[in-house]
Amino acid sequence: MYNGPMLEALPLEVFFGVGGVFSVLVVYFALFRGGKAPPSKASQELEQLQKTVAEKQSPRKNYKTLQEAMSQTQKSFWGRMSSSLVGGGAVDRAQLEAIEEVLYTSDLGPKTVQRLFASLESKLSQSLGSDALKQALKQEMISIFSSVGDINNTAFQVLPQGLTVWMVVGVNGAGKTTTIGKLASQLQQSGKKVMIAAGDTFRAAADAQLKVWSERAQVEIYSPENVKDPSAVAFEAVNKAQARGFDVLIVDTAGRLHTQVNLMEELKKMKRVIQKVNVTAPHEVILVLDANSGQNALIQAEQFHQALGVTGVILTKMDGSAKGGVAIGVAGDVGLPVKMIGVGEAVEDLRTFSPTDFVDSIL
């Protein structure tokens, strides 16, 4: 009987050499793992992406109310403001100045704060209590939203006939690609024939994400191989979408900082190229902003609007953010309508923006 050391107590290199160990592992996976080699990092990332998109498209079991989604902003905004109104009775000058400080630190933007404060200050002589002051603040906020669009109709434009083109822009990390996927899914569910143009030719992951979203949403994607010019992608996409009778074309663009002048010029070029194919397009230039960016989101909005003539804003990641007041600043400081907000991961969590409901949820 062999009384030496057990084989498993010795490293494999003793028997097979370093190179041989790799061969043994390959044979092991081939024989005992169904003939499949270990999944590559790329395949694992794609699998995770597909899983994530599937989860976002699945029906929500617990639908979040807007009040629940905006709870952090409500605590940060009215929660801090109401602490300045302790004691009851009419609001005095000192309390009003404390409210002004809360407004300035709530990501509303300086112009918006000045307008709100002036409105409240003009009512100081009326000896308003805290409830009356809250109502006055609500009315002025809704007035700000009304000044940039119809507060009862904030939907993006879809033409009754012919092709509608939406151009979607924003910085990296704002949730632009995911938002495009959700928009496409919602349009498809409403009966529209939708195409997505993969105009972000700089980030490989963007193309992969859009392809997964297009498959899940059952919409077509135009993503030509070996084409690195985003304007060329946009040009051909508009031509193809028009020729084949699509209702809506959503053009993705490369995410870039609003301070990158050359890249912003490229976006201008894309818009001009789209107009060469369809003189009325793009019918919407949609800016996606991360609500957590706060004051920086207002700077982004100003720069993108100056360069491209933004027609509407989508604010993402509003749920769990204490900076939701930026929606008021987008309207008051930049003069742009907020059209939709993202309050969760699911497709239906990208919602049409109601200024009245929004104001009620934070005050």
Kindly label every feature range from the protein language model.
Residues 1-155, 159-162, 167, 189:
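Non-catalytic terminal/linker segments enriched in charged/polar, low-complexity residues
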Residues 111, 135-363:
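P-loop/Walker A NTP-binding module and the surrounding RecA-like catalytic core of P-loop NTPases
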